[in-house]
């Protein structure tokens, strides 16, 4: 009798497991959330300042966590020798990039530029593979420094723009990088989500509009990495994942 009971119990358990499996499959098959769901989450994440509460190794890192995951995947595939960051702030993202690059295991340097390092975390300053430069990112001297680093660390480049978000400044940054980036290099223009794309409507022309203006002038410079941009449903860099042609 005990053996029969255990057999029936086992069969019931298997049936319940099968029903759950079918229900799970059906949910995945028939539930197709609209883009509006992702947009609402985007607005929630931004509007509640979740991005300002994000840290890396205890250092503030004002980023979308899904974007950061995307960046490490890009770095792993691209295997650049030079990472360029315009906009240092606390230094968390620069340290993050350096740690990822060390795992890739080839000689590299991270150059991060900001017009003020007053907010820079002292722990970030101890990072040996990051070069912190206090300057406007559009100063011609920055282009000269990038060229020197290219000579010292030949190979692919990953660049990310996250400093002054005004259209004219971002456009100037993109133009400064134009002669420095080669085919296959990667550029991310962050915060193109502001000015109603979909957050902070009324901000005024910003990174999104800078990308459009750049592409009007130089339509063949970049192709858009739509797969990366859309991978996690939303990004702080819409229209801003760019691969140099």
From Swiss-Prot:
GO terms for molecular function: methyltransferase activity. Belongs to the rhamnosyl O-methyltransferase family. GO terms for cellular component: plasma membrane. GO terms for biological process: chondroitin sulfate proteoglycan biosynthetic process; DIM/DIP cell wall layer assembly; lipid biosynthetic process; methylation. Keywords: Lipid biosynthesis, Lipid metabolism, Methyltransferase, Signal, Transferase. Residues 1-38 form the signal peptide. Its EC number is 2.1.1.-. It is an enzyme of class 2 (transferase). InterPro entries: RhmsylMtase, RNMT_CmcI, SAM-dependent_MTases_sf. Was identified as a high-confidence drug target. It comes from Mycobacterium tuberculosis (strain ATCC 25618 / H37Rv). Pfam families: RMNT_CmcI. The keyword Repeat does not apply. This is Rhamnosyl O-methyltransferase.
